[in-house]
A protein has these predicted regions:
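P-loop NTPase motor domains
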Residues: 1-199
Length: 199
């Protein structure tokens, strides 16, 4: 890459059409298009890219725990960004427990997807779908499918640690935490005006 990163607004597409190739080929910039009016025409971006990258590197080098720590760091950043989209965690007042727990739950699910899902399924939509599926009531009294899934992991698995507050909550509180996570993901995916992520 050449020089500093920058963002240029281009409402008509003239900048990209006239200078995109030059910027790419002559100045070696990575040029990406984000079209909010027509998201399917945008360049793709996998929010879980860095989590997946470091999780894969850790799987190849299991002795280097710094790689797994990086995957966990990026999973936490993604979850925090999606849960606290406006950046102000203090604004949630009495509901702070649910938002904090939803952040931990989402971090946990992101790590599970990065570690165990098939490569083509390792993206944010899979996080949404997995949380939705795991919300279903189970045949075990007092536990939903998410809790049963995490029970299958070793006690020292970080996915269990991140989900700790949610795992220790009662049935109703756990359902609220999962609903909060789904709600925040849902608001990220679509805004009702065509500017959201296409599922």
């Amino acid at each position: 890459m050449s020089g500093m990163s920058f963002l240029a607004t281009d409402t008509k597409g003239d900048l990209y059409r006239n200078y995109g190739r030059i910027t790419k080929e002559d100045y070696h910039y990575n040029v990406a298009v984000i079209d909010l009016r027509n998201p399917t025409q945008s360049d793709g971006n996998n929010l879980l890219h860095l989590v997946n990258k470091y999780m894969d590197a850790y799987k190849e080098n299991p002795d280097d725990i710094s790689l797994k720590a990086r995957a966990e760091k990026y999973a936490k950043i993604i979850a925090k960004t999606l849960i606290y989209g406006d950046g102000d965690a203090s604004a949630y007042g009495q509901n702070a427990f649910f938002y904090d727990s939803a952040e931990g739950l989402m971090t946990s699910v992101i790590l599970l997807i990065a570690e165990f899902a098939e490569p083509k399924e390792r993206h944010i939509v899979s996080v949404f779908k997995l949380i939705q599926e795991l919300m279903a009531p189970s045949n075990v009294k007092g536990k939903n499918h998410f809790q049963l899934l995490l029970d299958r992991l070793p006690m020292d698995h970080k996915a269990r640690w991140f989900a700790g507050a949610a795992l220790s909550a009662g049935e109703q509180a756990m359902a609220s935490v999962m609903s909060t996570a789904l709600s925040r993901l849902n608001s990220f995916f679509g805004y009702g005006d065509g500017t959201g992520v296409v599922l």
